[in-house]
Amino acid sequence: MKEFKFNDEQLSTIQELEVDIDLKKLEIAISKESIDELSEDELLALLKVTNALYRSGFPVIEDILYDSFWNKFALNHPNHPFITSVETEVLNLGKTVALPQKMLSTDKAYSKEEIKKWLDRILKAAEELDIDTNEIEIRITPKLDGYAAFDDGERLYTRGDGVKGQDVSRAFERGLKVVRNSERGLGAGEIVINKAYFEKKLSQYFENSRNIQAAIIAEKNVDERVLEAIKEGACVFHPFAVLPNWTGNYQDLMTDFDGIIEQVWNSVEYDVDGVILEATDTRIKEHMGANRKFHRWQIAFKINDEVAEVEVISVTPQTSRTGRVTPVAELVPTRISGAMISRVTVHHYNMVKINGVGPGAIVQIVRSGLVIPKIEKVIKPVDPQMPELCPSCKSHLLWESDHLVCPNKSDCPAQTENTLVHFFKTLANNDGFGPKNIEKLANLGVKHIHQMYDLKPHQFAMYGFGEKTSKNLYDQLQASKNIEIEDWRFLSAFGVSRLGGGNCEKLLQHYSLRELFEATVEDIAELNGFARVSAEAIVKGLANIKEEFFKVYDLGFNLSITPKQSELESLASPLTGKIVVFTGKMLQGKRSDMEKHAKALGAKVGTSVTSNTTYLIAGLKVGETKINDAKEKGVKVLSEQEYLDLIS
Ligand SMILES: NC(=O)c1ccc[n+]([C@@H]2O[C@H](COP(=O)([O-])OP(=O)(O)OC[C@H]3O[C@@H](n4cnc5c(N)ncnc54)[C@H](O)[C@@H]3O)[C@@H](O)[C@H]2O)c1
Ligand SMILES: [Zn+2]
C-alpha cells in the first residue's frame, strides 16, 4: 500500500476551501481508498478537498473512487447542496453572472450494463410517448476533458455552479478561436489543447493542460508560450455541437458497442475522459427532463484505467508467422478492470533485454477498460534470460534490429502453422479452419497450404476428425476455391511482410499475379506509394513464397482480377465529371436507378437545371417550357434514347 500525503501546493489549495478537518484522517482514507473510518462530515470534507484538487489539475484519487464516495454521501444526504448542484470550479475571479442557460453535469456509467439500463429508460420514455423505439436516435460524442465554458455569441462564461458562472470573455480577446474557425454562439463546450502540441511544446513547462486552460481565462499575464499555442490554433474553444459523433438507434449501438465507443473515443486530438451518450429527440428530452445535477436523457460513459504491480513468473518465447519471436510475460494472475490477467506480451526481445524483464521482475500493468493490458513500466528489473533457439524448431535465433528471428522459413512448425491460420483467416470464405483444427492437422504433418488442399475426406478422418466433420472440412476447402475472391486478397493471404490487402491491391493495379513475381525492386519502387526498402522486402518476400504460391494458385481458385490502372483511365465514361438532370417518366426503368447508374459512371446528378448542368435527360410528359428553359441556359437536352446511346 502506498502512503499518501498532501504536498505543499495541495495544502494551499485546501486552505482556501476553509474546511475544518483533521487532514491526517483524510490522508489515511486516501491511502486506504476507504471511507469506513470517516464520519459524514469528514466524508463531505473529503469530497470537497478531492474535488478542489481535481479542478486545480492535481487529482489525488481515481474518478471511479471519487464517484463511489460521492454516491455513498448522496445516499444519506440526497438533498444536500453538494449533491444537488454541480461541483463548483475552484477558480475564483470575483463577481458571478447568471448563465444564459443552465449548465449541468452528467450522470455517469462505468459499465455496459449501466449504459443498457440507461438505454432502457430512454426506450421506456419512447413507449410512453408512443414513439417507435427503432426511431430513437442516440448520439455519441467524445467527452472532452478540458475547461467547461458557455459561448452565447457575445460572452464566454465558466460553468460555475451551473446557474451562475463567471464572465471570461477575455479568453476570446486573447485570440482564442472556436475550433476550425466555426462561428461564435454555439453554446456549451470546453477549452481544450491539442495533445500532440502539448507534448511537444508545452509539457516541459506545464504539468498538465488544465493549468494552461485556467491561465487563459484567469491570469492577468498569460505565458507567451500559451499565447503562441492559441495563435497556432492548438488551443481552442470546442463547442459540443460541432464534435465528431456517431448516431444510430439502440440496435445499431448494441451490434458493435465496444467498437463504436472506441471509435468515438479516439475521434479527437484532445484529452478525452469518456464518451457522452444522449437521446436527440426533443420529445424524449422534454419528457425525461433533468434533476438539479444532470439531464436524464444524457449519460457519460467512463472507463477506469486500472493499474497493478505484478510479478513476472517467466517469459515465454513464441514464434510468429514471420519468424519473429515474441516474448510473452507469464504473470502471477491478477484481477484488473474486472478481468483476470495472467499474461501480457512484451513487444520484442530488445525490450526484454534493456528493461530486465524476467522471472521475479515486478512490472506495472495498465488496462484501460476494454483495451488489452500492457506493461507500463518495469518497477523491479532482473537479469533477463535470452533464448538462443527457436522454441518451435530449435534453429539458432538471429537478431534483426529489435527482434530475435527464427531463420528457418520453410520448416519451422510455428511459422508454417501460423501461416496456415493466416491464410484461411484472410480468405474468410470458409468455416472449419481456425487455429484449433489447424494445430491438430499441423501436428500430424500438414505443413503447407497446398498439402491442406490435397486432403480427401477419409484422410481428415485418419487425422482423428469425425466422419461428418471430415466431410464438412473437405466441402469447405472446395468451397473456398469456388467462391469468387479478389486476387489481391488471395495474395495477401500468403502473409508476406508488407503485402497486406492495400499494398496487394495497389500492385495488382499494375501487374498481373504472374507478372508481379517477375517484377524487380526498381519496378516496384517506381510505383506511387512504395519506398525502396518496401520494394526490397516485397521482392524478397515474393521470392520466398513463389514455389508454394504457384502450387496453390494452380489449384484453380476463382479469382476476380483487380482492374488495371491503365484500363481504369481509358475507361473514363462520357459522363465523367458531367452534371446531369433527369426529368419526366423513363421507359427503361425507374428514374432513381438511372440516377444511380449515372453516378456510377462518374456523373453528378442534379435535381434542377442550372447553367452548370451538362445534360437534361427528358423522359415522357415533360413540359415545353422546361425544355426551352434548359436550352436557354445552354444545357443540352437529350431524349432517353439519345442518352442511352451516349453511355452505351
Ligand atoms: N478524481 C477526483 O478526485 C475527482 C474529483 C471531483 C470530480 N471528479 C470527476 O468529475 C466528475 C464531476 O465533474 P463534472 O460535474 O465536471 O462532470 P464531468 O466532467 O464528469 O462531466 C460533465 C461535463 O462534461 C462536459 N462535456 C465534455 N464533453 C461533452 C460532450 N461531448 N457533451 C456534453 N458534455 C460534455 C460538460 O462540460 C459537462 O458539464 C465526477 O463524477 C468525477 O468523475 C473526480
Ligand atoms: Zn523456428
UniProtKB/Swiss-Prot annotation:
Q: Which residues bind Zn(2+)?
A: 390, 393, 406, 412
The record's listing under InterPro entries reads: BRCT_dom (IPR001357), BRCT_dom_sf (IPR036420), DNA_ligase (IPR001679), DNAligase_adenylation (IPR013839), DNAligase_N (IPR013840), NA-bd_OB-fold (IPR012340), NAD_DNA_ligase_OB (IPR004150), RuvA_2-like (IPR010994)
Report the cofactors: Mg(2+); Mn(2+)
Q: What class of enzyme is it?
A: ligase
The record lists the catalysed reaction(s) as: NAD(+) + (deoxyribonucleotide)n-3'-hydroxyl + 5'-phospho-(deoxyribonucleotide)m = (deoxyribonucleotide)n+m + AMP + beta-nicotinamide D-nucleotide
Binding residue positions for NAD(+) = 63-67, 105-106, 159, 190, 302
| Catalytic residue list | 143 (n6-amp-lysine intermediate)
Q: Which UniProt keywords apply?
A: DNA damage, DNA repair, DNA replication, Ligase, Magnesium, Manganese, Metal-binding, NAD, Zinc
**Mind listing the GO biological process terms from this record?**
DNA repair; DNA replication
Domain BRCT: start-end pairs = 570-648
Q: What is its EC number?
A: 6.5.1.2
Report the record's disulfide bonds.
none
Molecular-function GO terms, alphabetical = DNA ligase (NAD+) activity; metal ion binding
Q: In terms of domain of life, where is this protein from? A: Bacteria
- Family statement: Belongs to the NAD-dependent DNA ligase family. LigA subfamily.
Role according to the record? DNA ligase that catalyzes the formation of phosphodiester linkages between 5'-phosphoryl and 3'-hydroxyl groups in double-stranded DNA using NAD as a coenzyme and as the energy source for the reaction. It is essential for DNA replication and repair of damaged DNA.
Please state what the protein is called: DNA ligase
What species is given as this protein's source? Shewanella baltica (strain OS155 / ATCC BAA-1091)
Gene encoding the protein:
ligA
